[in-house]
Structure formats: structure tokens, C-alpha cells
Amino acid sequence: MSLRIYNTLSGKVEEFVPINPPKVLIYTCGVTVYDDSHVGHGRSLIVFDVFRRFLEHLGYQVKFVRNFTDVDDKIINRAKQECTDFMTIADRYIARYYVDMENIRVRPADVEPRVTEHIPEIIEVIQKLVEKGYAYVVEGDVYFSVKKFKDYGKLSKRDIEELIAGARVEPSEKKRDPLDFALWKASKAGEPAWDSPWGKGRPGWHTECVAMVFKHLGETIDIHGGGLDLVFPHHENEIAQAEAITGKPFARYWMHNGLVTVGGQKMSKSLGNYVTLREVYTKYHPDVLRLLVLFTHYRSPLDFSWEKMEETLKAYERLKNAIEDLELLKKLQVVESKEGGTHPLYEQVKEFEENFYASLSDDFNTPEALSHVYKLVGELNKVKNKAYSEGKITDRELSAYEFASKSLLNTMKKIFGLLEDLYPECKVERVVERELEAGQVFDEKLIQILIEARNIARKEKVFKVADYIRDKLKELGIVLEDTPAGTKWKKREGA
């Protein structure tokens, strides 16, 4: 089955054919480090984290580069507000970024370059553009002449005149044309600056990524990614510079994730309607945010709300419980099956895996892939509910449940980065806590299972867990009594 992805450049879904298989070169634009990352940043990070995992599953050798913009007007302004230097601000928020990434389970990129570490490479790119006549110097500033690049607008599907009329461009009296953009900015008092052939200054935003791609990946890469809001002007300007220098395609495929909105408005710091990743992962398990992102197709807008987080939490718990329930089922009476042949779950797992990967191969359709996940969860729940109602499970059913739940767990870990803190043999105390909090203790069969779990904990000298089960049962009106003949239980009067 071939992978097909939507290419912003062509405007259609195309078969993915790498330049030099099995190697795949990917670059995505990283954050400007002047504040904490918000859910909008998190969506892009999660989308490309999962896409990278899927490519690796397909057997590709992925080299993934994601940069830091660590010198910028916003960083400089933040430094002035705090009466410190820009690098202190950048270092602080890069450190906090790494904490955020660990907490939302996003793997580090293979290379994570900083702009300030690539000033010579940036200057080299600008020099080539000046030499080729695509850039001009005015009083220490250097600008790219947009009209000199004939293919300008091919990514955003707009012509030059339309762009001039409607684009957000940075005005300047020094520009020859309103659409021209800065490659190098002459130094200003109190701002960071580096030596260059045009005098002291600092790089413009659009040149940084070109220089870092050239250095770490080469002149043409397989995939360039980022948020939809970067198509114009940022990615359009990257194409203009890179292809003006090399005469080659800068990237074969351009992938853009949709924006995160709040009440229909783009989530952004300028509008003040943002929610930081820290706010989310201090309230919810990181898998809940990952699931929220994956429940929406990567190219569609995602409207964030705390209500949606609550809905997603329920979906997360349903998935997690289906896997953890294996431990409870093992505590039931296991009887020999009288049925022959393999259990239907084995075929359902095969069907799940085929459909799951087919959905991801069709323009990375994660919501459709998740529909197959929850179909399998439903089949697991049928087996579980039957066993609970009968107070026993056949060896045939238990083996099939174990096979299916472990298959599901491995797929979720490997591809979606979900349930990474669960193991095939799930911790009994976690299952016990969930069942107790669900208030299901008056089911006699379940009480016996919990007593058995407590006995195991005592035998293994995990007294914290044993005491937790006893105390929690007591809170819910069940009193345990340890006797030479075993543990007995009774309902507390009035319970």
C-alpha cells in the first residue's frame, strides 16, 4: 500500500515518492522562543511527531530537522521589558520548550538548530542572492526583489498583483516594491547585531530556514512542513530564495496542518486567546491532548475548548481501560473452552491493522484510523462484559483478549505515541483504583477480585497498595477482616 499525502504546492493528494529512498528528509519550522508554547504550536508538533513515527514504521530512514528562532523582534522586546539580554530570554524558553515536549510525548528532532548558531550560513545565502541580482542593499539593509522571481506565489496560489493588494507585508521606505522582504536588517541601538558585508545587523526571519535547510539537509528536501498560517509569506519567501539560488525545487512536498481556533478565531498570543501547553498537561494526561489532535484531520481547523478536552478524556479512558482490563480478567475463574477454532478477535485484530494503516496511508487520516481503534475496543468490551456477567472467562477468550489488547497497545505506542506509560502487564493498583473510583464495589465478584489483588500486594510486600485497597473499600462501605482462613468482607451497617 503506497502512502499518499496532500501537497500544498500542487493542491492535490499525491503518492509520496522520496528523492533517495529509503531516506526521507523533513524540515518543519519551529517556535520563536519568547514565551511558552501554546496548543496551536502543540498541534503542529504532535501532527509531525506522529507522521514521522508512521514513516519510520513504513521502513523509511527519516532525518527530521526543526529549528528555533532565537533572535527576533518579539524576543528583543521581551528582553527589554525584563531588563535583560535577548539570549537569556531565548535560553529560558528553549529550556521550557523541552519540558513541554517531554510532557506531551513529542520526540526531539534529529537536529534542532538555532538561528544564532547559523549566522555565517545565513550571510552566505544572502550574498548569493545579491550576486545573482535577486537582492539589493539599501543603507545596511538587504531586501529580496520579489518581482525578479517569476514563480513567486506558486505555493499560495496567488499572483503578484493579488498579493500586493491583499497581503500583510512589512512597509519600509527603503523597499523598491511593497512585497520585497528583508533578508538582513541593519543594526539598531540596544539590539543584537553581527558583522556582515553590509555592516552590523541581524537576519530577517525568512532567510533563516533556507540557510538551515541547506546546511543540515541539502538543496532539495522531501517534505517541508508547518502550520497553514506559514504558507504566506514565510514559506512562499523560502521557496523564492532557495530556488533563486539553486534553480532546483526546494521541497517536493509541502505539508501544512490546519490552525487551532478558539470560538472560530485563530489561537494566538496577539489576540490573547491562547492556552499554553502547560495549562493543558497539568490538568490532563498528555495522551488526552494527543488524542484531541488526532481526532481531527491534520488539514482541518481544530476548535479548542475545555469541553472538548473532557469529551476526549472519556475517549482516552475507554481506550486505556480496554487494555488495563486484561489484568482484571486474569483474576476471574478461567475455565476450559468447549468451542473449537480460533476466537473471532484474532481476525478482528488483523482487520483492524489493515484498516488502521490504510487510513494513515490515505493522506494521514488519523480520525478514520481512530474509528478502527474504537471498533476493536468495542469488540474487546463485548468479551469483557460477557466475562463479568458470568464471573468467569474461558481460556480461549482470555488468550484472544490478551493478544488483541497487546496488539492494540503496541500500535498505539509505536504510531500514535499513546499509552507509553502502560505495559503489556498493566499495574494491578492502577486497575484497582479505576474500578474503586467507578463505584462498582458492590459487585461481589469484583470485591473478590480486589481482595485477591490486595493479597498479592501483601505477599509481594507492596503494603501501600494493600492499604489503599483496604482503606478505599472501607470508605465505600466494605469492611475487610483478615482471618487464618483468609480475608472476609462485609458491608458496614448503613452502607
Curated annotation (Swiss-Prot):
One of the GO biological process terms: cysteinyl-tRNA aminoacylation
Binding site for Zn(2+): C29, C209, H234, E238
CDD domains xref list: CysRS_core
The keyword Transmembrane is annotated on this UniProt entry: no
Pfam hit, one: DALR_2
Positions of short motif 'KMSKS' region: 266-270
One GO molecular-function entry: zinc ion binding
Compartmental location: Cytoplasm
Domain of life from the UniProt record: Bacteria
Enzyme nomenclature, EC number: 6.1.1.16
Residues annotated to bind ATP: K269
GO cellular component: cytoplasm; cytosol
Keywords in alphabetical order: Aminoacyl-tRNA synthetase, ATP-binding, Cytoplasm, Ligase, Metal-binding, Nucleotide-binding, Protein biosynthesis, Zinc
Sequence motif 'HIGH' region, location on chain: 31-41
Class of the enzyme per the UniProt entry, highest EC level: ligase
Assembly: Monomer.
Membership in a protein family: Belongs to the class-I aminoacyl-tRNA synthetase family.
HAMAP family, sorted: Cys_tRNA_synth
Protein name: Cysteine--tRNA ligase
